[in-house]
Amino acid sequence: METDTGALPKKQDFSEWYNEILWRAEIMDVRYPVKGLYVWFPYGFAIRKFVYQHLRELLDRDHKETLFPLLIPEQEFMKEAEHIKGFEDEVYWVTHGGTTPLEVKLALRPTSETAIYPMFALWVRSHADLPIKIYQIVNTFRYETKQTRPLIRLREITSFMESHTVHATWDEAEIQVESEIALTREFYRNLCIPIIISKRPDWDKFPGADYTIAVDAIMPNGKTLQIGTVHHLGNHFSRTFNIQYEDKNGEQKEAYQTCYGISERCIAALISLHGDDKGLILPPTVATFQVVIVPITIGKRHEDVLAAAGKLKNDLENAGLRVTLDTRDLRPGAKYYWWEIRGVPLRLELGPRDLDSGKAMAVTRTGEKTTICLANAAEDTTSILTGITDAIRAKAGEHTKSHLCTTHTMDGLDIALNEGKVAVVHWCRDRTCGDTIEEKANSSLLGTEVRSEYIEATDGPCIICGKPGKATLVGRTY
Ligand SMILES: Nc1ncnc2c1ncn2[C@@H]1O[C@H](COS(=O)(=O)NC(=O)[C@@H](N)CS)[C@@H](O)[C@H]1O
């Protein structure tokens, strides 16, 4: 599909850059005539496929994939008081089948606890049925009233991975929470996205959860994006939905649960953190094409060059790489531009001189220039791709580290936030001090028990009242 040409906005104008890159790199078409609903272009959908393929590989180590209905009957949805309170303003309802009014209104799942847990009540009888660990990757619907943005805040979340587990004890559920956190670390390491993990304050936890562990990334404009959440549900839902099991002594016991969610925000973070003024930069593990071969066929030996380029493509594909050979009738420079904006990590240029030297020019999207030996193409290319991954990961790490700081005063917090940074402060965990931090610094208190390789989270006197406080993450959020 032909998209516009011409310079991209600079990445420092992040909002404009982000919107333009979704169009120019053929990720999403935002022209769909319903607010908060967007269309995947095939190129963007291929990135989603590789990202979620990796997420499935990680989940399949310990969970089983399944699929539950989209529509939830009102009586089930309305069963869990806190859950309703959390979602009553966001849930879409289906009220008619054709022209016939439905006897029972049906909710479009905003998340699937109230679809799945009545079935768990049927599946769980004995301790031998536990643990249950399932997930699904589905679309969910939330009538978001804050500003909608493609991949970031949608009304139809098209790529909502939700995992739901059932355990015999609270402790086993907590072990599962830690296991999902480890899985999330591995997932985001593969995407070269640095994350900061923290425990959301009680007033910001998932409706019906005992506690929520959240995963945040720091976006180029310094705002944090919540790119994953793991919830310990205690026996809150099992009590409401009667998910009980007979233990070894024949007694009826309530089960304990977790749920865990990642949406296409992971792709928003991938695009935002790694891109530059020339466009996307995709980590090789999830790039639609890892290599683009551009034959330089100006002048003589046209056929030889094309033949050598074809052989190079085969060699690389036989080594399992995703390669495209661009033989379009365009100037090489136009091809370079086309694939740079689409974030292809490695370009191989092959001209007549290279045939004689048995080499090809290798230009990485992270700014390196080197050569590969055609006789050793697969090995040379694979090692360059590894180097590209390391460079992408290092750059994102530098960005995150430089946008994180510790401060002990409200003035310091204000300065940090106005500089587009995220701060670690000390908070006594008293709600009134929390509210003061949020109001005075126009910020969100993201959480305590901060875990990040980029910050030393120590304890100290509360930034408001001076009482003993805990390291607490504070930022401005999407
Ligand atoms: N409107 C939205 N658009 C895109 N992603 C969203 C939206 N709302 C939430 N998310 C993402 O989905 C994740 C899970 O959503 S959640 O409400 O926190 N948790 C749940 O729904 C739980 N049932 C776990 S699946 C969030 O961490 C956030 O990254």
Curated annotation (Swiss-Prot):
The protein's Enzyme Commission number: 6.1.1.15
Subcellular location: Cytoplasm
A GO CC term assigned to this protein in UniProt: cytoplasm
Origin superkingdom: Archaea
Coiled-coil features, chain-numbered ranges: none
Major subcellular site: cytoplasm
GO biological process, one term: prolyl-tRNA aminoacylation
GO molecular function: ATP binding; proline-tRNA ligase activity
One Pfam family hit: HGTP_anticodon
The keyword Ubl conjugation belongs to this UniProt entry's keyword annotation: no
CDD domains documented for this protein: ProRS_core_arch_euk (cd00778)
Record's catalysed reaction(s): tRNA(Pro) + L-proline + ATP = L-prolyl-tRNA(Pro) + AMP + diphosphate
Alphabetic keyword roster: Aminoacyl-tRNA synthetase, ATP-binding, Cytoplasm, Ligase, Nucleotide-binding, Protein biosynthesis
Family note: Belongs to the class-II aminoacyl-tRNA synthetase family. ProS type 3 subfamily.
Subunit field text: Homodimer.
Comment text on domains: Consists of three domains: the N-terminal catalytic domain, the anticodon-binding domain and the C-terminal extension.
Function: Catalyzes the attachment of proline to tRNA(Pro) in a two-step reaction: proline is first activated by ATP to form Pro-AMP and then transferred to the acceptor end of tRNA(Pro).
Protein name (record): Proline--tRNA ligase
Organism listed in the record: Methanoregula boonei (strain DSM 21154 / JCM 14090 / 6A8)
Lineage, highest ranks first: Archaea, Methanobacteriati, Methanobacteriota, Stenosarchaea group, Methanomicrobia
Gene of this entry: proS
